[in-house]
């Protein structure tokens, strides 16, 4: 959004804001980014090179939401390293947004304003299209169409798509609230680090 072009060249890249490389929250940002992107063993070397022992003590800002413990990783990439459940991937994205905002001096309210005004399509999907089942999987549209007609009376057969049965209840999540929660928690963690030094 900062540079809406088909190609971003070095001069444009150099003007983009970036967090300080020595910021105390950088390992938290790196962990979430790596777990979103290191999807196959082709990324094993990158994972090993970037691994920080502090990853193992990191945790989600909304711990009861995610299905995968964030800090349950080691220095060697395994098939368990990447975040695969939709709700975990969503939470990582929310926390990355909050971390970068905090690191760049953007308030939580400003972050939410950017989300509403610059990412209107995502805002709409978050409120109307992205439903997660009881196991954190994104529910397909064909299942949601039946649910909209039948509500909680939807049958098990109607909740089954491909090889997955999507278990009730289905949830949407409030990205703005989650970004605020993440932001406040990362502020608290940053202040705690400052008093521990």
Question: Which residues does each PLM region occupy?
Answer:
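S-adenosyl-L-methionine
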Residues: 1-197
């Amino acid at each position: 959004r900062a540079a809406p072009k088909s190609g971003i060249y070095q001069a444009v890249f150099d003007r983009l804001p970036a967090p300080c490389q020595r910021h105390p929250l950088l390992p938290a940002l790196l962990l979430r980014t790596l777990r979103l992107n290191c999807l196959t063993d082709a990324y094993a070397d990158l994972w090993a090179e970037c691994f920080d022992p502090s990853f193992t003590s990191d945790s989600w800002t909304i711990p009861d939401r995610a299905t995968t413990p964030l800090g349950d990783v080691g220095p060697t990439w395994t098939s368990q390293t990447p975040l695969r459940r939709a709700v975990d991937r969503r939470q990582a994205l929310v926390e990355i947004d909050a971390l970068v905002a905090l690191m760049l001096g953007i308030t939580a309210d400003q972050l939410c304003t950017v989300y509403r005004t610059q990412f209107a399509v995502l805002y709409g999907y978050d409120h109307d299209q992205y439903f997660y089942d009881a196991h954190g999987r994104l529910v397909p549209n064909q299942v949601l169409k039946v649910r909209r007609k039948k509500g909680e009376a939807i049958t098990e057969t109607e909740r089954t798509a491909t090889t997955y049965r999507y278990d009730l209840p289905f949830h949407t999540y409030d990205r703005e609230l989650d970004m605020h929660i993440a932001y406040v928690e990362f502020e608290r963690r940053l202040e705690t680090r400052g008093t521990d030094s």
